[in-house]
Amino acid sequence: MAHKVTSANEPNPLTGKRLSSCPLTRSGVTEVAQIAGRTPKMEDFVPWTVDNLKSQFEAVGLLMAHSYLPANAEEGIAYPPLVHTYESLSPASTCRVCDLLDTLVNHSDAPVAFFEDYALLCYYCLNAPRAWISSLITGMDFLHILIKYFPMAGGLDSLFMPSRILAIDIQLHFYICRCFLPVSSSDMIRNANLGYYKLEFLKSILTGQSPANFCFKSMWPRTTPTFLTLPGPRTCKDSQDVPGDVGRGLYTALCCHLPTRNRVQHPFLRAEKGGLSPEITTKADYCGLLLGTWQGTDLLGGPGHHAIGLNAEYSGDELAELALAITRPEAGDHSQGPCLLAPMFGLRHKNASRTICPLCESLGAHPDAKDTLDRFKSLILDSFGNNIKILDRIVFLIKTQNTLLDVPCPRLRAWLQMCTPQDFHKHLFCDPLCAINHSITNPSVLFGQIYPPSFQAFKAALAAGQNLEQGVCDSLITLVYIFKSTQVARVGKTILVDVTKELDVVLRIHGLDLVQSYQTSQVYV
C-alpha cells in the first residue's frame, strides 16, 4: 500500500504556496539558498562522529527496537515493523525520507546550511559500506540535522516509529535508491527499471520468496557487446575473456573500474597529510557499539565461532555499555538482533558465514579495518608457494602466526578474532556485496578530521550537486541484489545459472576478481 504524499500541485497549507515537486535538486538548492540568505554561524556538523550518536541515544534505542524480526513467525503479517518494511519496498510507495524532507523544507525557511549538511551526509554515505552499522549511524546523523535546523518541527523525538521512518527508509534513501544523486532526464527511465528490480528482489530477500513470473534471461537488459566500452585498462586477453552478452547500454557511461576509480578531492586533514600517519588523530570508532548490540545474538555465536563477550578490551567502553542498556522488544527475535537495519534484513547462517558480514561492519566501525584486511589479504596470497586452498591458507595464518595480533587497536583486534576463517574467505574472495563494500569504503572520509579552510567551500559545492558521484554503477549493485536474493530465496536452477554467469562477467568488467558466483551461492550466504 502506498502512503499518501502531498502533491506538487496542492497549495502548502501553511504558506499557501505550491510545493516543489523535487525540493532537493540542484536548482531547488540554489533557489532555496537565494531565498534563505545567510544564517547565523552554527557549530559545524560532521557525520560519522560518535558524539552525534551519543546525543541521540534514546532515538538509537527506538530505531533498534523497531528493527527486530518477530519472534513468532506466524505473527509477522501483523508485526508493525515488518508491515512497514514491506510497504516501503512496494514499487507503488513513495520514499518516506523524501516526503519528510519535502514537508520540512517547504513548510519552513530552511537555511543554506541545512542543504550543505544534508549533502555532506550524502557524500559520507557514498564512501561508506552498505552495512548494519552504516544504516544506524546515517539514521542518527540524519536526525541530528533535522533537530538542528527544524527545532520547531513536532514529533522528531519519536521519528523512528512504524508508519513514520524506520531502517528500511534510511537504507532506501541513502544506500539503495540514493535519491540525492543528480540525474539527467535521459537516465530516468533506465533508473526506474533498475529501481524496480532492486525493490522486487529486496522484497524477495525479506520474504524468502522469489518474484513471480520473472525470467532473468529475457528481462535483464543486455545488448550487443564491445570490449572497447569497458572501463579501465584492458589487454587483448582481457577482451577475449569477456563473453558475448555484455550489454553496451548497461556498462558504459555510468560504469566504474572500482580498484582504479578516481576519488573526488576532499577537505579531510587525514587524507591531505598522507593517509594513516600516526600523528594525525582520527575520530572515535564504533566497535563498542557492535559488541554491545550483538552480544547474546547468533551473529558470532554458535558452532565454529567464539561467543561474544565484553572482554578486557571492551571493559569501560561507553558505547558498549549504552548498547547493552537498550531494551529489546519482547515480541522481537533476540537471536537475530536488530537485523532489519542490515542489507539482508535478517541473520541467516550457512557454513560458518552470516548474512550480516562482521568484516563489512568493521569497515564502517573502525578507521583501521580496511587497511588491516588489505594487509591480511596480501599475506594470504603471498605466504605460500604451493597450491594450498585459500580457506586453508586463512586457517593456517590465523592458527600458526597469530596474524591478527599485530592490529594496534585492541577493540578492532578483539572483533576480528571473533570472526571465523569462513568470514574472511567470504569477505575477501567470494561475496560480491562484500567486495563492493570493501572497494568503496573510504576511511579517510568516514573517520578523518576536518580541515577547516576548505571545508565550507566543499560543503557548498556538494549542496550545488557537485562531487556527488555514484561510487558503484547502478547496474552492478542491482545485479548483486538479484544474486543475494538467490542465496536466501528459492529460485530455479536456470535462473541461478543465468544470474551467476552474468554477474561473473560484470564483476570482472568492474575490476573485482572473485571466485565464481555460483560457488559463492552454494557455499555461503
UniProtKB/Swiss-Prot annotation:
What residue spans carry the region label Zinc finger 1?
A: 95-179
Q: Which UniProt keywords apply?
A: Host cytoplasm, Host nucleus, Metal-binding, Zinc, Zinc-finger
Citing just one GO molecular function, the answer is: zinc ion binding
This protein's record includes keyword Zinc: yes
Which segments carry the region annotation Zinc finger 2?
Answer: 357-434
- Span list, region Disordered: 1-20
Comp. bias (Polar residues) = 1-12
Say what the protein does. Answer: Plays a role in efficient localization of neo-synthesized capsids to nuclear replication compartments, thereby controlling cleavage and packaging of virus genomic DNA.
Annotated protein name in UniProt? Packaging protein UL32 homolog
